[in-house]
């Protein structure tokens, strides 16, 4: 066998392995989202004041234990979450949207963008006297399919716990 022929054979094998790898990644890839919402008997401005006062999170928030940094589009923040029955995790996302009395949204990535991304949002909608708080996380990227249902369930339970604590804090003022 000549060197050029074995080089072509090796190249063909490598291309085949790469194709199989990409097909597996695509087969395992699945974008996912989790959401929890709650109605709060206070206007959005009252709920916003609590949500935006991130320095007070440790005193009332069972899920987002700490949020450090400025809530301004483009700024990098540090977020420590404590999902129920799990170890705390720290992320450093970039703030995408801040609309007073309406929405906070940030995007975090593990490694490089597109590998494993999480876009988190808090949306406030009003029916006149009450606020509908919608907390949502959209997971996307090549490795999202590796997220276990257990992690998603625990994270959602954390959303619910935070929403309930926020409701209690807002309605008791």
List the predicted regions and their residue ranges.
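A conserved amphipathic terminal alpha-helix motif
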Residues: 3-12, 132-134, 138-173
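Hydrophobic/aromatic beta-strand elements that line small-molecule binding cavities or substrate pockets
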Residues: 36-38, 91-97, 108, 118-126
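A short, structured loop/turn motif at beta-sheet edges
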Residues: 41-44, 72-73, 96-103, 123-132, ...
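Short beta-edge strand/loop motif at the mouth of beta-sheet-based domains
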Residues: 55-90, 98-99, 103
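A mature extracytoplasmic/lumenal domain signature
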Residues: 63, 81-83, 97-99, 108-110, ...
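Short glycine/serine/proline-enriched coil/turn segments at secondary-structure junctions
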Residues: 85-87, 112-116
């Amino acid at each position: 066998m000549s060197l050029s022929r074995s080089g072509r054979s090796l190249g063909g094998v490598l291309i085949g392995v790469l194709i199989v790898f990409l097909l597996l990644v695509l087969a395992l890839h699945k974008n996912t989202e989790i959401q929890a919402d709650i109605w709060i008997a206070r206007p959005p401005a009252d709920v916003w004041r609590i949500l935006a006062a991130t320095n007070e999170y440790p005193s009332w928030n069972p899920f987002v234990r700490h949020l450090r940094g400025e809530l301004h589009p483009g700024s990098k923040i540090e977020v420590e979450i404590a999902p129920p029955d799990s170890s705390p995790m720290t992320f450093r996302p970039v703030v995408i949207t801040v609309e007073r009395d309406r929405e906070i949204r940030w995007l975090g990535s593990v490694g490089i963008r597109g590998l494993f991304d999480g876009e988190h949002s808090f949306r406030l909608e009003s029916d006149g006297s009450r606020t509908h708080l919608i907390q949502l996380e959209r997971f996307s990227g090549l490795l999202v399919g590796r997220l276990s249902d257990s992690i998603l369930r625990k994270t959602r339970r954390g959303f619910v716990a935070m929403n309930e604590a926020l409701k209690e804090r807002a309605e008791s003022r």
